[in-house]
Protein backbone atom coordinates (compact mmCIF):
# COMPACT_ATOMS: atom_id res chain seq x y z
CA UNK A 1 0.00 0.00 0.00
CA UNK A 2 1.05 3.57 -0.59
CA UNK A 3 3.38 3.41 -3.62
CA UNK A 4 3.37 2.42 -7.27
CA UNK A 5 4.41 -1.15 -7.91
CA UNK A 6 3.62 -2.28 -4.36
CA UNK A 7 3.36 -6.07 -3.91
CA UNK A 8 -0.06 -7.55 -4.65
CA UNK A 9 -1.36 -11.11 -4.45
CA UNK A 10 -4.58 -12.74 -5.65
CA UNK A 11 -5.39 -16.29 -4.58
CA UNK A 12 -8.30 -18.50 -5.66
CA UNK A 13 -8.71 -22.00 -4.28
CA UNK A 14 -11.40 -24.67 -4.39
CA UNK A 15 -11.58 -28.15 -2.92
CA UNK A 16 -14.10 -30.96 -2.70
CA UNK A 17 -14.40 -34.28 -0.93
CA UNK A 18 -14.52 -37.31 -3.24
CA UNK A 19 -15.68 -40.33 -1.16
CA UNK A 20 -14.90 -43.01 -3.76
CA UNK A 21 -11.28 -41.76 -3.86
CA UNK A 22 -11.03 -41.88 -0.03
CA UNK A 23 -10.01 -38.23 -0.01
CA UNK A 24 -10.45 -35.01 -1.89
CA UNK A 25 -9.27 -32.94 -4.84
CA UNK A 26 -8.38 -29.29 -5.07
CA UNK A 27 -7.43 -26.41 -7.34
CA UNK A 28 -5.23 -23.46 -6.38
CA UNK A 29 -4.38 -20.37 -8.44
CA UNK A 30 -1.98 -17.71 -7.12
CA UNK A 31 -0.94 -14.52 -8.89
CA UNK A 32 1.81 -12.28 -7.46
CA UNK A 33 3.16 -8.97 -8.71
CA UNK A 34 5.99 -6.81 -7.35
CA UNK A 35 6.95 -3.85 -9.48
CA UNK A 36 7.69 -5.19 -12.97
CA UNK A 37 7.95 -8.82 -11.82
CA UNK A 38 4.94 -11.18 -11.92
CA UNK A 39 4.33 -14.83 -11.04
CA UNK A 40 1.38 -17.11 -11.75
CA UNK A 41 0.95 -20.56 -10.23
CA UNK A 42 -1.73 -23.10 -11.16
CA UNK A 43 -1.91 -26.32 -9.10
CA UNK A 44 -4.25 -29.31 -9.04
CA UNK A 45 -4.04 -31.56 -5.98
CA UNK A 46 -5.24 -34.84 -4.50
CA UNK A 47 -5.15 -35.89 -0.84
CA UNK A 48 -5.83 -39.32 0.64
CA UNK A 49 -7.39 -39.35 4.12
CA UNK A 50 -7.63 -42.13 6.71
CA UNK A 51 -8.44 -42.53 10.38
CA UNK A 52 -5.45 -42.48 12.73
CA UNK A 53 -6.04 -42.69 16.47
CA UNK A 54 -8.52 -40.04 17.60
CA UNK A 55 -8.06 -38.02 14.42
CA UNK A 56 -7.51 -38.18 10.69
CA UNK A 57 -4.35 -37.98 8.62
CA UNK A 58 -4.21 -36.71 5.06
CA UNK A 59 -1.37 -37.17 2.58
CA UNK A 60 -1.39 -35.40 -0.74
CA UNK A 61 0.45 -34.15 -3.78
CA UNK A 62 0.00 -31.21 -6.12
CA UNK A 63 0.95 -30.90 -9.77
CA UNK A 64 0.82 -27.83 -11.95
CA UNK A 65 2.56 -25.03 -13.80
CA UNK A 66 4.52 -22.04 -12.51
CA UNK A 67 4.94 -19.02 -14.80
CA UNK A 68 7.12 -15.99 -14.13
CA UNK A 69 7.82 -12.86 -16.12
CA UNK A 70 9.42 -9.44 -16.19
CA UNK A 71 8.06 -6.40 -18.04
CA UNK A 72 11.07 -4.28 -18.96
CA UNK A 73 9.14 -1.71 -20.99
CA UNK A 74 8.75 0.62 -18.00
CA UNK A 75 12.36 0.46 -16.82
CA UNK A 76 14.58 3.51 -17.29
CA UNK A 77 18.18 2.23 -17.27
CA UNK A 78 21.00 4.52 -16.16
CA UNK A 79 22.83 3.75 -19.39
CA UNK A 80 21.54 2.67 -22.78
CA UNK A 81 22.33 -0.78 -24.13
CA UNK A 82 22.16 -2.58 -20.77
CA UNK A 83 21.58 -6.18 -21.87
CA UNK A 84 20.59 -7.22 -18.34
CA UNK A 85 17.35 -5.22 -18.66
CA UNK A 86 14.84 -6.40 -21.29
CA UNK A 87 13.12 -3.80 -23.43
CA UNK A 88 9.78 -5.61 -23.36
CA UNK A 89 7.97 -8.50 -21.70
CA UNK A 90 9.93 -11.72 -21.10
CA UNK A 91 8.43 -14.78 -19.44
CA UNK A 92 8.53 -18.55 -19.18
CA UNK A 93 6.88 -21.49 -17.44
CA UNK A 94 7.82 -24.81 -15.87
CA UNK A 95 6.09 -27.84 -14.37
CA UNK A 96 5.91 -27.67 -10.57
CA UNK A 97 5.34 -30.28 -7.83
CA UNK A 98 4.36 -30.12 -4.17
CA UNK A 99 3.49 -32.56 -1.38
CA UNK A 100 2.26 -32.48 2.19
CA UNK A 101 0.86 -34.31 5.20
CA UNK A 102 -1.84 -33.06 7.60
CA UNK A 103 -3.19 -34.49 10.86
CA UNK A 104 -6.17 -33.17 12.79
CA UNK A 105 -8.44 -34.04 15.69
CA UNK A 106 -11.49 -32.21 17.00
CA UNK A 107 -9.27 -29.74 18.88
CA UNK A 108 -5.91 -29.54 17.09
CA UNK A 109 -4.15 -29.76 13.74
CA UNK A 110 -0.58 -30.18 12.51
CA UNK A 111 0.67 -30.01 8.94
CA UNK A 112 3.90 -30.08 6.96
CA UNK A 113 4.32 -29.47 3.24
CA UNK A 114 6.85 -28.61 0.57
CA UNK A 115 6.54 -26.50 -2.59
CA UNK A 116 8.78 -26.44 -5.69
CA UNK A 117 10.02 -29.91 -4.70
CA UNK A 118 12.14 -30.42 -7.80
CA UNK A 119 13.50 -26.85 -7.66
CA UNK A 120 12.53 -26.13 -11.28
CA UNK A 121 14.33 -23.47 -13.30
CA UNK A 122 12.08 -21.26 -15.42
CA UNK A 123 13.78 -20.13 -18.61
CA UNK A 124 12.56 -16.75 -19.80
CA UNK A 125 12.03 -15.99 -23.47
CA UNK A 126 15.26 -13.94 -23.57
CA UNK A 127 17.31 -16.95 -22.40
CA UNK A 128 17.77 -15.82 -18.78
CA UNK A 129 16.86 -18.22 -15.98
CA UNK A 130 14.58 -17.81 -12.96
CA UNK A 131 15.31 -20.59 -10.41
CA UNK A 132 12.70 -21.64 -7.83
CA UNK A 133 14.02 -22.75 -4.45
CA UNK A 134 12.31 -25.54 -2.55
CA UNK A 135 10.19 -24.20 0.32
CA UNK A 136 9.00 -25.93 3.49
CA UNK A 137 5.89 -25.05 5.51
CA UNK A 138 4.85 -26.07 9.02
CA UNK A 139 1.48 -25.20 10.57
CA UNK A 140 -0.04 -26.09 13.95
CA UNK A 141 -3.01 -24.94 15.96
CA UNK A 142 -5.24 -25.75 18.93
CA UNK A 143 -8.74 -24.68 19.98
CA UNK A 144 -9.62 -24.05 23.65
CA UNK A 145 -13.20 -23.73 24.91
CA UNK A 146 -13.18 -20.65 27.17
CA UNK A 147 -16.97 -20.67 27.56
CA UNK A 148 -19.85 -22.38 25.78
CA UNK A 149 -19.73 -19.82 22.94
CA UNK A 150 -16.23 -18.30 23.20
CA UNK A 151 -13.19 -20.11 21.77
CA UNK A 152 -9.47 -19.31 21.87
CA UNK A 153 -7.48 -20.47 18.85
CA UNK A 154 -3.67 -20.08 19.03
CA UNK A 155 -1.67 -21.21 16.01
CA UNK A 156 1.70 -20.89 14.31
CA UNK A 157 3.00 -20.84 10.75
CA UNK A 158 6.62 -21.40 9.70
CA UNK A 159 8.00 -20.98 6.19
CA UNK A 160 11.60 -21.70 5.18
CA UNK A 161 13.70 -22.24 2.07
CA UNK A 162 16.56 -23.73 4.08
CA UNK A 163 18.45 -20.43 4.19
CA UNK A 164 15.89 -17.92 5.49
CA UNK A 165 12.73 -18.40 7.56
CA UNK A 166 9.53 -16.55 8.35
CA UNK A 167 7.39 -17.35 11.38
CA UNK A 168 3.92 -16.14 12.38
CA UNK A 169 2.46 -16.60 15.87
CA UNK A 170 -1.32 -16.11 15.87
CA UNK A 171 -4.09 -15.81 18.43
CA UNK A 172 -7.78 -15.65 17.51
CA UNK A 173 -10.91 -15.30 19.62
CA UNK A 174 -14.03 -16.87 18.10
CA UNK A 175 -17.42 -15.72 19.42
CA UNK A 176 -20.43 -17.41 17.82
CA UNK A 177 -20.20 -16.33 14.14
CA UNK A 178 -17.43 -13.69 14.55
CA UNK A 179 -13.69 -13.85 15.08
CA UNK A 180 -10.84 -11.45 15.60
CA UNK A 181 -7.23 -11.61 16.62
CA UNK A 182 -3.63 -10.62 16.17
CA UNK A 183 -0.63 -12.24 14.51
CA UNK A 184 3.02 -11.43 15.13
CA UNK A 185 5.46 -12.03 12.29
CA UNK A 186 8.90 -12.33 13.84
CA UNK A 187 11.16 -9.34 13.09
CA UNK A 188 8.67 -7.98 10.54
CA UNK A 189 5.34 -6.78 11.87
CA UNK A 190 1.92 -7.25 13.40
CA UNK A 191 -1.19 -8.43 11.56
CA UNK A 192 -4.70 -7.52 12.76
CA UNK A 193 -7.41 -10.04 11.83
CA UNK A 194 -11.21 -9.99 11.80
CA UNK A 195 -13.95 -12.03 10.17
CA UNK A 196 -17.63 -12.88 10.07
CA UNK A 197 -19.59 -16.01 9.21
CA UNK A 198 -22.44 -14.43 7.26
CA UNK A 199 -24.33 -17.72 6.99
CA UNK A 200 -23.49 -21.44 7.08
CA UNK A 201 -22.00 -21.25 3.58
CA UNK A 202 -20.42 -17.78 3.34
CA UNK A 203 -17.51 -16.35 5.35
CA UNK A 204 -15.76 -12.99 5.06
CA UNK A 205 -12.43 -11.97 6.58
CA UNK A 206 -9.92 -9.13 6.47
CA UNK A 207 -6.36 -8.60 7.67
CA UNK A 208 -4.18 -5.50 7.99
CA UNK A 209 -0.42 -6.00 8.05
CA UNK A 210 1.49 -3.32 9.98
CA UNK A 211 5.16 -3.67 9.04
CA UNK A 212 7.89 -2.73 11.49
CA UNK A 213 11.06 -3.46 9.50
CA UNK A 214 9.93 -3.87 5.88
CA UNK A 215 10.32 -0.77 3.65
CA UNK A 216 7.52 -2.07 1.39
CA UNK A 217 4.97 -0.56 3.79
CA UNK A 218 1.69 -1.85 5.18
CA UNK A 219 -0.64 -4.22 3.32
CA UNK A 220 -4.31 -5.19 3.37
CA UNK A 221 -5.88 -8.60 2.70
CA UNK A 222 -9.48 -9.63 2.01
CA UNK A 223 -10.69 -13.25 2.23
CA UNK A 224 -14.00 -14.60 0.90
CA UNK A 225 -14.99 -18.24 1.41
CA UNK A 226 -18.09 -19.98 0.06
CA UNK A 227 -19.11 -23.59 0.74
CA UNK A 228 -21.29 -25.34 -1.84
Can you say where each PLM-predicted feature lies in the sequence?
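Subset of outer-membrane beta-barrel
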Residues: 1-228
Amino acid sequence: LGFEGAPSTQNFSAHAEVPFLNGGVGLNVVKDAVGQFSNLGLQASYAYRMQLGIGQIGMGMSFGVFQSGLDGSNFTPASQGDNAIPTGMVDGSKLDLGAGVYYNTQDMYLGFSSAHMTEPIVEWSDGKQYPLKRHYFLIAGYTYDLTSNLLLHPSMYLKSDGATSQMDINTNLIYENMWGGVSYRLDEGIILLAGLEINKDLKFGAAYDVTLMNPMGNSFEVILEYNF
